Amino acid sequence: MNNTDTLEKIIRHQKNKDPAYPFREHLLMQLCIRTNKRMQDNISEFLGGYGINHSAYMVLTTLFAAESHCLSPSEISQKLQFTRTNITRITDFLEKAGYVKRMDSREDRRAKKISLTSEGMFFIQRLTLAQSMYLKEIWGYLTHDEQELFEVINKKLLAHLDDVSS
């Protein structure tokens, strides 16, 4: 019996006790949670092979996409919805690795900017290429139509969850 069979058995037991119990909804929620966890674990393991975590990767890609590859800590924080404290911690790690450097802002001498170094540019380009192949391996298991449907359903659910929680 595989993991999902066990999960279904447990949820079906609840359904048998209460015929009104939302079996399908509970199963879908559990499948989403487990799929998300497994994907996060796989991505963490992949990025760990390059010596970074997902948060550091997101900071690097955000800087790479920025004009002149340079942003303030608050701009990064806002774009990624990370706390300023977390951005400081990640920046310390990336600076120690040689991927970013802190610079004085030209607009405000009191402010700092975080800029990708040439080593950071090379690293993120190499990592992005490897990640592209990895993502194709993961998502290539689904057909193009299944991928599109998955995207539509997830966007719809995310929008609904935003409405429900506000």
Give the ranges of each region predicted by the language model:
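C-terminal regulatory/oligomerization modules of transcriptional regulators
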Residues: M1-A20, D145-S166
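N-terminal leader segment of winged-helix/HTH proteins
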Residues: M1-Y50
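N-terminal helix-turn-helix DNA-binding core of bacterial DNA-binding proteins
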Residues: F23, K37, D41-F82
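Active-site phosphate/pyrophosphate-handling residues
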Residues: L27, M58, E148
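Short amphipathic alpha-helical segments with heptad-repeat character
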Residues: M29, I33, K37, Q81, ...
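Short, hydrophobic-biased segments on the C-terminal half of alpha helices
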Residues: P73, T91-D92
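Charged, amphipathic alpha-helical coiled-coil/dimerization segments
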Residues: D92-L149
